[in-house]
Amino acid sequence: MMVTGCLFLAVAARAEARPLLMISVDGLRPGDVLEADKRGLKIPVLRKLAADGMTASGVRNVLPTVTYPNHTTLITGVFPSRHGIAGNVTFDPKQQNMDSWYWYARDIKVKTLWDAVHAHGGKVASLSWPVSVGAASIDYNIPEYWRAHNADDIKLVTALATPGLVDEMQKATGLALAKADGDTVEADTGRLRYAAALIAAHHPEFTTVHLRALDHVEHETGPGSKESNAALESLDRAIGETIAAARKATPDLAVAIVSDHGFSPVEHDVNLIAPFVQAGLITLDAKGKVTSWQAEPWGSASVAVVLANPKDEALKAKVAKLVKELAAKPELGIADVADESAIAKMGGTPMASFWIDFKPGYTMGADPSKPAVSPGTVKGNHGYFPTQPNMRATFILEGDGIAKKSLGEIDMRDVAPTLAKVMDVPFPGPDGKPLY
């Protein structure tokens, strides 16, 4: 009798858990939702979710404020210094790894929400989430991955996806994977249709979806441009259709709308590579490729400086002197320089001995032959220190039983434990805490 009662209580407690759909709109600034009228944005779906749910005025994200480290913090609740995803691209000063990104889940050094839900007996689904290739705890996975940026990439993604899943989604939606993979609004819309079909067919407890178009357009045309606004309005409609279809299949579905970072307009590229070459810290060949290095700047809107031998105090002193001299030149637009202690407080990778942050409007250029400062090659960027207000990300959580609440500004590390609580899943280990 006691055993039966305990089992009943366990089942009843589990029945209160809500399945969850987390949609990341890469590059979505919180003000685009909270100040939509002021910015001339017609996004009724996102506005209603924010009005009806738990909404942050902004999310303090992690160093660097780029896609892959922040998406990994969203599903782990820890800083990059703990989860191991240091940037978007891997550190590769000699460019021997063909511009490889941190695609592979095996590089995550801590437990994820995917792991927690799977271990608790729940099904997990994911579409184009960063750092998801080979994630064993994702039952239905079409990961984010590319190589040649041509049609063969679709074959690669299909091979890396859960066996049979791409064929199943293509048949269910009538959309070829080529129409649901990439960084266009069309691809994001297709990806959302896949998500709705997947939820209807398999009823996963946890689904993660990454939308890439807004970020892409903001880089090309700048944040708040008419093109960026048009992209967001299109995504708003597609998100609304997806939620409606998903809730038809799973009525108690909770929805989290998140982003990884904000955006800043860019006007200037800064050549940081040339001063390192002139100081004898980097050697380039005739084509401008690195042949040897002692210290390498790595990044864009903020720049990690990695030393070949960080225990070499003479080298560290030489680099510290150079960085100080660069920061003293106002034309370079350097806002701040962090040492190892400050980097550790912001949770950045311990690979970096120094970290240079640019002012809004400035970013590091990629061409060592260009002048010290030249016109920007992109119109918008992110990656600055998370202390910069325009880097704030978005968080909205909505669903039955979730209180309407203005959260103010939150820490990104609080997102994962909050979502674990929504799903009633044990999740030990995060640095953050539930928001309710």
Give, region by region, the residue ranges found by the protein language model:
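Substrate-binding rim/cap in mid-to-C-terminal beta-strand-loop elements of soluble/periplasmic
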Residues: Q278-A320, V378-V422
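A long, amphipathic alpha-helix that forms part
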Residues: D32-V33, V185-V209, L214-A256, K318-E325, ...
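Structural recognition of the beta-strand scaffold that forms the well-ordered cores
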Residues: L20-S24, S57-G58, T73-I75, V124-S128, ...
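Active-site-proximal N-terminal segment of extracellular/periplasmic enzymes that hydrolyze or transfer
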Residues: A15-M54
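Bacterial N-terminal signal peptides
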Residues: M1-A10
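Secreted, luminal/periplasmic, and some membrane-associated catalytic domains
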Residues: V25, S57, P64-V66, T90-R106, ...
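His/Asp/Glu-rich, glycine-adjacent segments
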Residues: F79-G222, K318
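Short, solvent-exposed turn/loop segments enriched in Gly/Ser/Thr/Pro and often Arg
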Residues: T55-V78, L127-S137, D431-L435
